C-alpha cells in the first residue's frame, strides 16, 4: 500500500470516528433536552454546572450535527477522491479551529465580562424559578451539593425566590460548614452571611484552574487532531488529479 492510499484509509477511519461521535452527541443532546434531571444524576455536578450557563441539550445537538456532517464529508471526500468535498472539509475545520482559538482567548481575557453577563442572565432565573420549577431546582441542588457552593454569586441570589418565600430560609448549601462538614441551621440571612459560601461560578472557575493541566492537555489534543486532519485533507487534495 502506497503512502497516498495509507493516508486515504486513515482519513476515512478518522472521519468515521468523527461521524460516530457526532451521532452520539446528537443522541445525548436529544436526551438532555427531553430528560435533563436524569442526565444530571448520571454525569454529576459538573454537568449540572454547565446547564446553568448554556442550554446543554441544544448545544450538544448543534455540536453533534456539525461533527456528523463533518465526518460524513471527510469520509465521502476521501473515499470518492472528491477535491470539492476535501476542500469544503478543510475550510469548515479551519473555521472551527479559528473559532475555538478565539473563544479560548475571549474566555481568558474577558472572564469578568462573561461573569457579569451570566450574572445578569442566571440570577433573575434563580429568583424566579428556584423552589417553584422542579427540574430547575433539582439541577441547582445537584450543582451546589457537588461543588460545595451557593447560588451563582452567593446566597443573595435566592432573595425573593419562591423557595425563600415559602420556607423563610435559604437553601442549606448556603450555610455549609466545610470545617465540620455539616450544615448550619437555620440557614437564615445572618448565618448565610457569616458562612460566606463561595458562589458556583467562582467555584467552577477555581476547579477548572486547579485542573488546568488536564483541561489544557485535552484542548491541545483536540487542536492537534484538527490540525492533523486539515494537513491530511490538504495532502489528499494536492495529490489528486
From Swiss-Prot:
It is found in: Lysosome membrane. Residues 1-11, 74-88, 233-241 are cytoplasmic. One of its GO terms (biological process) is protein stabilization. Residues 33-52, 110-211 are extracellular. Its main location: membrane. PROSITE patterns: TM4_1. InterPro entries: Tetraspanin/Peripherin, Tetraspanin_animals, Tetraspanin_CS, Tetraspanin_EC2_sf. GO terms for cellular component: cell junction; lysosomal membrane; nucleoplasm; perinuclear region of cytoplasm; plasma membrane; vesicle. Glycans are attached at residues 141, 154, 167, 180, 189, 194. Keywords: Glycoprotein, Lysosome, Membrane, Transmembrane, Transmembrane helix. Belongs to the tetraspanin (TM4SF) family. Interacts with SLC19A2. Interacts with NTRK1/TRKA. PANTHER family: TETRASPANIN, TETRASPANIN-1. This is Tetraspanin-1. It comes from Bos taurus. The gene is TSPAN1.
Amino acid at each position: 500500500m502506497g503512502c497516498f492510499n495509507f493516508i486515504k484509509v486513515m482519513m476515512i477511519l478518522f472521519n468515521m470516528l468523527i461521524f460516530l461521535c457526532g451521532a452520539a452527541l446528537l443522541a445525548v443532546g436529544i436526551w438532555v433536552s427531553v430528560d435533563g434531571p436524569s442526565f444530571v444524576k448520571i454525569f454529576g455536578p459538573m454537568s449540572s454546572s454547565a446547564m446553568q450557563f448554556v442550554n446543554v441539550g441544544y448545544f450538544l445537538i448543534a455540536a453533534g450535527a456539525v461533527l456528523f456532517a463533518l465526518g460524513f464529508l471527510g469520509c465521502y471526500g476521501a473515499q470518492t477522491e472528491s477535491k470539492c468535498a476535501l476542500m469544503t472539509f478543510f475550510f469548515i475545520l479551519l473555521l472551527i479551529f479559528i473559532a475555538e482559538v478565539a473563544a479560548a482567548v475571549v474566555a481568558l481575557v474577558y472572564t469578568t465580562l462573561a461573569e457579569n453577563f451570566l450574572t445578569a442572565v442566571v440570577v433573575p432565573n434563580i429568583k424566579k424559578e428556584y423552589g417553584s420549577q422542579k427540574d430547575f431546582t433539582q439541577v441547582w441542588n445537584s450543582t451546589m451539593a457537588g461543588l460545595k457552593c451557593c447560588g451563582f454569586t452567593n446566597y443573595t441570589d435566592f432573595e425573593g425566590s419562591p423557595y425563600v418565600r415559602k420556607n423563610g430560609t435559604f437553601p442549606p448549601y448556603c450555610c455549609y460548614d466545610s470545617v465540620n462538614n455539616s450544615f448550619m441551621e437555620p440557614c437564615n440571612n445572618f448565618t448565610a452571611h457569616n458562612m460566606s459560601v463561595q458562589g458556583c461560578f467562582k467555584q467552577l472557575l477555581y476547579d477548572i484552574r486547579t485542573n488546568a493541566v488536564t483541561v489544557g492537555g485535552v484542548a491541545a489534543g483536540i487542536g492537534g487532531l484538527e490540525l492533523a486532519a486539515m494537513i491530511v485533507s490538504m495532502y489528499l487534495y494536492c495529490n489528486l488529479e
